[in-house]
Amino acid sequence: MLGIIDYGMGNLHSVSKALERLSWSYIVSEQPEELQKADGLILPGVGSFHDAMSILNETGLTAFIKDWVDEGKPLLGICLGMQLLFEESEENKRTKGLSLLPGRVIRFPGVATDGSTYKVPHMGWNQLTFRKPNHPLLTDVEEGHVYFVHSYVVKTDADDVLLATSHYYETVPAVVGRGNILGTQFHPEKSSNVGMSILRNYGAMVEKGVKARG
């Protein structure tokens, strides 16, 4: 069973509907004792990094998520939820993240290297380029287009966490992962067959982990 973390800033309806289409059982809760019943967690998110971390800290969900990951259980961050996995964001000068993956989150500058300006946010369909096509999250997934909506982008020197990238005037980390910590910058639940395949694979990884733990 999957658990969707409800902290007031997630695209809960669309994620829930996607899991229903895949016939995965799930719960939606903000209570750690309820979420503890799940086998894998999804951290959705839309909006401000600063506001999201404030809520997670105030509700005790930050500590719960870190303990969950330390126990080796799977976590998938979506959109803002992926960005929260990293160390910090420059939003509101500096906001500390969950620090589960190395890197920081900065705003798209809106100015290309040739001096031309471009639109922020990065919004719409864009092509994936796989860095680690054999990763279980990308098994049998088409290297196709997915749906992005974001004004901030992850910067990391840790190439090992980049499972797939996209390009919007610069390299955009699109799928990240290290061990049981995974994330997508785009919305898989809004990304047609490619996105649904990734969600299906995440569910399969969770299921496999349950069997491995006995």
Swiss-Prot record:
It comes from the Bacteria. Its EC number is 4.3.2.10, 3.5.1.2. The active site is at C79 (nucleophile), H187, E189. GO terms for cellular component: cytoplasm. It is found in: Cytoplasm. This is Imidazole glycerol phosphate synthase subunit HisH. InterPro entries: Class_I_gatase-like (IPR029062), GATASE (IPR017926), Imidazole-glycPsynth_HisH (IPR010139). It catalyses: 5-[(5-phospho-1-deoxy-D-ribulos-1-ylimino)methylamino]-1-(5-phospho-beta-D-ribosyl)imidazole-4-carboxamide + L-glutamine = D-erythro-1-(imidazol-4-yl)glycerol 3-phosphate + 5-amino-1-(5-phospho-beta-D-ribosyl)imidazole-4-carboxamide + L-glutamate + H(+); L-glutamine + H2O = L-glutamate + NH4(+). Keywords: Amino-acid biosynthesis, Cytoplasm, Glutamine amidotransferase, Histidine biosynthesis, Hydrolase, Lyase. IGPS catalyzes the conversion of PRFAR and glutamine to IGP, AICAR and glutamate. The HisH subunit catalyzes the hydrolysis of glutamine to glutamate and ammonia as part of the synthesis of IGP and AICAR. The resulting ammonia molecule is channeled to the active site of HisF. HAMAP family: HisH (MF_00278). One of its GO terms (biological process) is L-histidine biosynthetic process. Heterodimer of HisH and HisF. Pathway: Amino-acid biosynthesis; L-histidine biosynthesis; L-histidine from 5-phospho-alpha-D-ribose 1-diphosphate: step 5/9. GO terms for molecular function: glutaminase activity; imidazoleglycerol-phosphate synthase activity; lyase activity. Gene3D superfamilies: 3.40.50.880. CDD domains: GATase1_IGP_Synthase. Residues 1-212 form the Glutamine amidotransferase type-1 domain.
